[in-house]
Amino acid sequence: MQQVRPNFSLISLILRKFAHQLITQMRIKYLILSIMLSLSATWNATAQDETLLNFGVLTRFDYQREYIDGSPIRENSGFKGKNLSIYFNGDLTPRLSYFYRQRLNRAHKDESFFDATDFLYLTYRPTDQWYFSAGKQTVSIGGYEYDLAPIDIYFISEFSNNIDCYQLGASVSFLFNDRNDELVFQFCQSPFRNIAEKEDTYSYNLLWSGAYKWFKPLWSVNMVEYAQGKFMNYIALGNMFSFGDASFFVDVMNRSVLRDPSLFLDFTVVGKFMYDICDHVSVFAKASHDHNKINSSGDPSVMPGTSITRAGGGFEFFPLKQNKDLRIHAVFCKTFGSNGNPEGALVDKQTYANIGLSWRMNLLSFRKKQKV
């Protein structure tokens, strides 16, 4: 009987291939482990004082009444959930930060989840003077009424009611004068892209903000595409003045169609006076006027034929000592004039009263431990 001898060359080949695969896998695992250890060491060395994560919730609940010429508007009266938002922000590296804020109370069938996202952007700071941001951010338009966060809005002008201020885009910022002044250039989606029904419409914005002893300007020049290839020009001048416990702002905005420039035919003026009676109580008075007498259509925010005024006031009470995260408010305003937009927010002979409770809750905060 013939003896069968093993094929040592075949066995040797199989063993060599197995050893090669094993060594390759070990090298890959070692490389991954080395990268992770390297990143960890770099993080520990450079991110000592960084905030990794802040997580919080913003909430506001109101009871309100609205009347038109003395007749109650039932659908806009009663208890209302005005704001329910969550936010995350922090540092990914010493030069790279992130911010995310989602409004949970904007759940409309014609909106996506991303439509209810206020902020979702990254900011890169190569130096202490230059900032580069990209993502969903506020359209950079001047004015202090426009600059209000949704949770702080009580009653606003027709212009501010009709502009979709959170859009995708990119911006570059330069800080100067000991960081007291900032210039921002921004390229983003048009705030009127939904009205134009064109995603491919844009806004080009240049914003200057400053902080001086008693004066804080918030000015901008904007070229806003309201229809495909058609632009509005904004000149928005926000001016904040502070004197002790009293402060007030005056916003002046002129709007004109680029093909037919005009001055003070289409404009909005807003003024607000605020006074801190004590650490717990603040009162304010506010008025706005929207005006558009341009014959041709073009401005989607304040339509032709509009000349409408809103005026009112209110108070804010902060129960916590040296903390304004919890707030109780009561406001009242009246509106009179004509609105060229039949579906506009401001209506002639409109009366509005509102009381409510809002609070800001910082639920979690993680910081990188300092290296000992």
Which ranges hold each PLM region?
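Cationic, low-complexity basic patches in intrinsically disordered or flexible, solvent-exposed regions
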Residues: Q3, F18, L22
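Sec-dependent N-terminal signal peptides
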Residues: Y30-L39
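Outer-membrane beta-barrel pore domains
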Residues: L58-R74, D110, Y121, R125, ...
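Loop-centered beta-sheet repeat module
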Residues: V184-N233
